[in-house]
Regions:
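A feature for loop-to-transmembrane-helix boundaries and adjacent hydrophobic helices
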Residues: 1-155
Length: 155
């Protein structure tokens, strides 16, 4: 996280304001919404919770002094949620075949990766889609296939 090797895109999107936890968020958001489009583009503090990485880090050298989405933290939280789903819900399921929890992990991780990829700087594209999205969809399809194949009693 502090090294800045895994970083998100600049936090310009309207969706990104949902995650703010600063106390004066509503004042900031109201003021920001009153700006014209050109003023919004030049606004110095686009999101109050963005992370400015040191210029010596890869993220800081690519986006100097610019607040970025902390994509690695988003992924951490989503992976913890996925772990709790697997540990407290799926592992207690009866009549599961071998590999059952593994395939569910692949599905949950792929969904997490699809979500987090919207906040990351991705250079690798497959046609007009980001490569992690394509790979994740393929992994979800393969996992569902094996879950249905190996767990006929479950479905």
């Amino acid at each position: 996280f502090m090294n800045g090797e895994v970083h998100g895109v600049p936090t310009f999107t309207p969706f990104s304001v949902i995650f703010n936890v600063k106390p004066k968020f509503y004042e900031w958001y109201t003021y920001y919404q009153s700006l014209s489009i050109s003023d919004k583009a030049n606004y110095p503090d686009l999101v109050p919770w963005g992370v400015v990485f040191p210029t010596s880090s890869p993220a800081g050298s690519e986006f100097p002094n610019l607040a970025l989405h902390p994509a690695m933290l988003y992924e951490l939280v989503l992976n913890l949620i996925g772990f709790f789903i697997i540990w407290f819900i799926l592992r207690k399921k009866k009549n599961k075949a071998s590999g059952y929890m593994w395939w569910w992990y692949i599905i949950i991780y792929s969904i997490n990766r699809i979500i987090v990829s919207f906040f990351r700087v991705e250079d690798l594209m497959f046609f007009n889609f980001r490569a992690p999205h394509v790979i994740s969809i393929i992994l979800i399809a393969v996992s569902i296939f094996f879950l249905k194949k190996d767990n006929k009693k479950v479905f």
